[in-house]
């Protein structure tokens, strides 16, 4: 996005209609295009494969993974968060983050991760104010 290429987008496996829309859109744009897709790895992340779609939804709803489109370096659209969740809801189901929630939870680390999510929410204006009220 920093290079101002014609089209950049992010997507998750939780919303295949959004992903399809972005792929079709990218096909019709001249020049460089880039789509980053959040795809969970059940084996590597230590979660049941049937939770893959849910983890994709949780990362978006936590704000850790903003889902957006940008043209020539300018954000033109975002997929709003309907129900903001704490990052713990995304992190806890994954065995790769178990060390954060042991006998002595790493509260400071979790708070830093939450701060990143909150920054994304503010930067990309991700909250759907109508759905939140």
Describe these PLM feature segments.
Residues 41-133:
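Flexible, low-complexity linker and terminal segments
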Residues 9-11, 34-38:
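Short, conserved beta-strand edge motifs with alternating hydrophobic and charged residues
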Residues 15, 38-43:
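Glycine-rich beta-alpha junction loops
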Residues 1-25:
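Conserved thiamine diphosphate
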